[in-house]
Design a protein with these regions (language model features):
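Alpha-helical linker/edge segments of TPR/alpha-solenoid repeat scaffolds
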Residues: 45-64
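Alpha-helical junction/boundary sensor with strong preference for TPR arrays
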Residues: 32-34, 54
């Protein structure tokens, strides 16, 4: 599969809220030999965004 095809699969996983699978696919795209620099940057930014979303904690909900 080409980097572009893998990127589309990663985007589909992200849209379906399958963040773990999306991160794995984004990493595969970033490591692909045929990936452009722009595509690699998009993948890295997407991974960082997903990790930021997953690490969000609303501290107001933790107060008794």
């Amino acid at each position: 599969m080409t980097a572009s095809e893998l990127f589309e699969i990663a985007q589909e996983h992200r849209r379906n809220k399958r963040f773990g699978d999306a991160i794995n696919m984004y990493r595969a795209v970033a490591e692909a030999e045929d990936a452009t620099e722009q595509l690699k940057k998009q993948c890295i930014a997407s991974i960082e965004l997903i990790q930021e979303i997953n690490s969000f904690v609303n501290v107001d909900l933790l107060n008794p």
